[in-house]
Design a protein with these regions (language model features):
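Alpha-helical hydrophobic membrane-insertion segments
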Residues: 6, 14-15
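Bacterial N-terminal signal peptides that target proteins for export
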Residues: 1-9
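Extracytoplasmic/periplasmic substrate-binding proteins
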Residues: 157-163
Length: 163
């Protein structure tokens, strides 16, 4: 019985030791657009834990955030992104046209899909004096819309197209 426990203990320690020898430290850079900062902080932490449990590798994901267009330009100009999560397919296409990613990136998933979600926030004055509650509220008399520069912000491009 003691021999059996000794053998099992030796095998277990060998497995743990071997796994730690082969485990890698992996650093990745996710270049993304501004509103995703908090999302990716949480997602990256969860993914790192998952990956370490699955493989034993320790993953550190660094983040770079800015306007989608500016981030695309940074990648085109040489920032070494491992992951690119931008607001518009247009920005990803610009990176692909410069040879930084596969030009056929859109065909990677079924139906040329790029699964993603985004949250829209209405920022109003204290007390919401104009009672902005939904999209229809935005066409009320006296309501003004402020949006970022569509030349550098993917969200602003969507705003421009929706107007």
């Amino acid at each position: 019985m003691l021999k059996r426990w000794g053998l099992l203990t030796t095998l277990a320690l060998t497995a743990l030791f071997t796994q730690s020898i082969w485990a890698k430290d992996i650093q990745l850079l996710n270049v993304s657009y501004d509103p995703t900062r908090e999302l990716y902080q949480q997602y990256n932490h969860a993914f790192s834990q998952y990956w370490q449990q699955k493989t034993g590798d320790h993953v550190i994901i660094r983040q770079s955030h800015g306007g989608s267009g500016k981030q695309a330009t940074a990648v085109i100009n040489g920032i070494e992104a491992d992951i690119v999560t931008l607001a518009l397919a247009y920005d990803i296409d610009a990176i692909a046209q410069r040879g930084r990613i596969d030009k056929q990136w859109i065909t990677r998933l079924p139906d040329n899909s790029a699964p993603y979600t985004s949250t829209i926030v209405f920022l109003v004055r204290k007390g919401n004096p104009k009672q902005i509650t939904d999209w229809d509220s935005l066409i009320k008399p006296g309501v003004s819309i402020i949006t970022p520069n569509p030349k550098t912000s993917g969200g602003a491009r969507w705003n421009y197209l929706a107007a």
